[in-house]
Amino acid sequence: MKYDFPKLDLHLHLDGSMLPESAWEMAKERNIKLPADNIEDFKKFIIVTADCRSVNDYLERFEMPLQIMQDSAAISRTAMELVELLASQGLVYAEIRFAPQLHTRNGLTQKDAIEAVIDGVNKGMEKCPSIKIGVICCTMSVGPETANMEEN
């Protein structure tokens, strides 16, 4: 059955949506130790498959993208490429969610991370005016209590 109505995605994790080829390239540029010697084996570490056995197995796939997305350029590029991908799939609206506190390992502030996502989203929407994107900032219940209250 074919449905002729606009497509949208209301729950899309930025750090779980990094293109494998971009992750591979950016990890190499940043001298991040890779868990594989080639892109095909690398994909096994970041792509969730149908035989995923637990939420912990699922969440492990987020670690490599998070290691990479610790600077504004990587965050912005990831957001821009995601917008372009969604537009190419025919979506007209999506809400991208992420936790700014998870992008502060190498000195970025939460504000820096938010600005990088907004920059990438705006660049993506400029290239692909058929799609509109909302950004949702999440607070996490892991780490010190002050991490979500920190003023940037």
Predicted regions located by residue number:
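Metal-cofactor-binding active-site regions of metalloenzymes
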Residues: 1-152
